[in-house]
């Protein structure tokens, strides 16, 4: 799992993304007395893409989608899995700047995950 997180961070970094934080969901749940399998949520931020949404009053409502996230988790079979929002699909629900930004993010995620995720 750690290797997968590192590979995602490295691939994302090559495209200009930073990782502001990784949430340890297993640890968070344990602090509440709940046991779950390992699960982490990595936040990815591309400053230039986020800026396009944040600078526009018309598009700022989409900041709830920022930063973009990737979940890396284990299942009972012991294998590591990765999931993320389909930003390319989400872009079809949008207009203007948000549509283009999320289309770009979707394309970036395809590139980031290539070679990391097996179909």
Which residues make up each language-model segment?
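Feature detects long, helix-prone N-terminal segments enriched in hydrophobes
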Residues: 1-119
